[in-house]
Design a protein with these regions (language model features):
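Hydrophobic alpha-helical transmembrane segments of multi-pass inner membrane proteins, especially
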Residues: 1-197, 237-297, 322-326, 346-366, ...
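P-loop potassium selectivity filter motif centered on the GYG triad
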Residues: 96, 102, 210-218, 308, ...
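Transmembrane helix boundary and interhelical junction motifs in multipass membrane proteins
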Residues: 130-135, 215-219, 230-232, 300-303, ...
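Re-entrant/interfacial helical elements at transmembrane boundaries that shape
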Residues: 137, 220-226, 254-255, 297-306, ...
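Long extracytoplasmic/lumenal interhelical loops at the membrane interface
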Residues: 209-246, 266
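Transmembrane alpha-helices of multi-pass inner-membrane enzymes
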Residues: 298-343
């Protein structure tokens, strides 16, 4: 977060101060999330609630008077002058829905029904032109299903279906629903050919990274403000320009290590519900990093997904803090499981030692002889 604040102060002081204040409030609020999860263990059975709440929250972006269109996507709403991106919070509800449904899956029919509900989330996101979120939700769900079933066929089949859906959708709707995506793909394929139009964002992003080089031009000495949406979608390019590609690689390593730590917590958790939740959070987290940095470096088309805890965006920061708080709760469960295991292990060892001590005392030569003699004399 400090990296994000530093860059935001460089780009836009007003936005940096706003994000700092709201993120501080979010940190305090998120401190209570592990306590709330501990008080409500029945959340694992709220599958229908998570599904309905998530879908209804997404639908608010389609309501005239509430919805806002920014950067080609209608995935924002405005309440009392405050811009909110429902997708950032719905992704948490989606993960909880997926986890609660996978815990109860006993038949293939149930898996199909749950998959249809998951697709409903994604269809609404398609109507909002938020294809980055669609990809994020889809990969997260496929990976959670794979973890729950341990069947690679579901993961392979899911990815194949995604590719097929993209191809068919492109053919059928390339001049309407997918027009926004076509612009981004064209800018991705050859940004310098459309440098003054569709490829302006990507070309300036690449110029910024190239200008900074390996060690950067120095904080305050570059021109990251020339990069469009540098405070959000392309903040990684701004960081590389002034702090260097080396610093950018270090930032990527921080994200990867965080992902590994969260995935490790998930794998150690014996509670299947929170195991799936934490794993889903870890996948969502690292996929956001991939989509943002991949778009900024022209590895993939730009998706508009924010860089967790670095990009400007109150909704993004709040949702990421909430996810970290949930992982923290899972970590407490794992710690408790380890403590219980160690206590049980210690109890068993002590019991075995006492048993061996009694056997040794009963079989000792000095004890057996005299006791028999006293018995005979009596």
């Amino acid at each position: 977060m400090l990296i994000g604040y530093t860059m935001l102060l460089r780009l836009n002081t007003k936005l940096a101060v706003k994000q700092f204040i709201l993120a501080s409030v979010g940190l305090i609020a998120c401190a209570f999330i592990p306590l709330l999860l501990g008080k409500f263990p029945q959340v694992r059975g709220w599958r229908n609630f998570f599904a309905i709440a998530g879908i209804l929250f997404l639908i608010t972006t389609l309501i005239p008077g509430l919805k806002m269109t920014m950067y080609g996507s209608s995935n924002w709403i405005s309440i009392a002058g405050i811009s909110i991106q429902p997708m950032e919070f719905v992704k948490i509800l989606f993960i909880f829905f997926a986890a609660s449904s996978l815990v109860k899956v006993n038949e293939f029919k149930e898996l199909v029904i749950n998959a249809c509900i998951a697709i409903a989330f994604m269809l609404i996101l398609i109507l909002e032109n938020d294809f980055g979120a669609v990809f994020l939700f889809y990969i997260t769900y496929i990976m959670m299903v794979y973890l729950a079933t341990s069947r690679p066929i579901f993961a392979i089949g899911g990815i194949a279906m995604m590719v097929l859906a993209i191809f068919v959708g492109y053919i059928l709707c390339k001049h309407s629903l997918f027009a926004h995506i076509i612009v981004r793909v064209r800018a991705w394929k050859d940004p310098f050919a459309y440098q003054q139009t569709d490829g302006y964002q990507v070309s300036e992003s690449l110029f910024g990274i190239g200008t900074g080089g390996f060690i950067g031009s120095g904080l305050g000495r570059g021109m990251p403000y020339l990069i469009p949406v540098a405070e959000s979608d392309f903040i990684f390019s701004a960081i590389c320009e002034e702090m260097g590609v080396a610093f950018g690689l270090e930032l990527i390593l921080i994200y990867v290590s965080s992902f590994i730590a969260m995935a490790n917590v998930a794998m150690k958790c014996k509670d299947p519900f929170y195991k799936y939740v934490t794993f889903g959070i870890s996948v969502t987290y690292i996929m956001q990093v991939f989509l943002n940095i991949g778009g900024a470096t022209k590895f993939i088309p730009s998706t508009g997904v924010t860089l967790p805890l670095v990009s400007y965006g109150v909704s993004s920061v709040f949702s990421t803090l909430i996810m970290f708080a949930i992982v923290q709760y899972t970590y407490t469960l794992v710690s408790k499981e380890v403590d219980d295991f160690e206590d049980e292990k210690y109890r068993i060892i002590q019991k075995a030692r006492r048993q061996r001590a009694r056997e040794f005392a009963g079989n000792a030569p000095g004890n057996a002889g005299p006791s028999r003699e006293r018995t005979q004399n009596q």
